């Protein structure tokens, strides 16, 4: 049984890498060469296939280990990639905006490459859970946090892309210099189909995506506090991960506050979202490389 699962695991890893590479190439060929737009369908299909293979990887490990596969760095990286791909697939389906896949495929390929090629084999293997992780809160807290990271990352990437394009426009470079400049955004299932230009599209979609990810982040932090009280007798201990999770929450709370109450649009909230992109990665990966705190187990040791 183990050998069969191990073969499925390796095969799925290879297929995931290959499909993400095809997805990346397809999307960017479509953006650079406007006459071959049909290549976007190859990119989208490859993204779906990559998401399926990661599902197989995580499902196989779940069956093998007997617990939800979120106990070490490799598993969390793969789950984060799954969240990124699933979110991109859904958003692209709803909006027909292929730029989403074009910006998500590179970061997904990088994460998968790092997790499968850079991490030592010992860190990729499922290991027995430490006592503190033997709880139903493992799935509730960690999975929700990872899903919030994936949606917040996509929302932030869209905001960063918005800033790149607006700066190019301000420097008197027409957006027509970009291969994707003439894309229009349509709400396919809206009663009144509305077309927006590219910059308005990115600003609006970034706001909506972050608006979805922020409640997930809030729920994940609350679930983690409840779990911490059960495991260590305290809801909050100012662990490095907890501190940076709070900083992440505050950054995106400021973003949504500015959008909702101050009616900010355009560049100003985009800068906040770009800051959030950096903060999310510090919270997720940077803190763990310190090897300190309650969240260091199962990651680098």
Swiss-Prot record:
Required during biogenesis of c-type cytochromes (cytochrome c6 and cytochrome f) at the step of heme attachment. It is found in: Plastid, Chloroplast thylakoid membrane. This is Cytochrome c biogenesis protein CcsA. Keywords: Chloroplast, Cytochrome c-type biogenesis, Membrane, Plastid, Thylakoid, Transmembrane, Transmembrane helix. The chain crosses the membrane at residues 13-33, 39-59, 73-93, 97-117, 146-166, 209-229, 236-256, 270-290. May interact with Ccs1. It is a multi-pass membrane protein. Pfam families: Cytochrom_C_asm. One of its GO terms (biological process) is cytochrome complex assembly. GO terms for molecular function: heme binding. NCBIfam families: cytochr_II_ccsB. Belongs to the CcmF/CycK/Ccl1/NrfE/CcsA family. InterPro entries: Cyt_c_assembly, Cyt_c_biogenesis_CcsA, Cyt_c_biogenesis_CcsA/CcmC. GO terms for cellular component: chloroplast thylakoid membrane; plasma membrane.
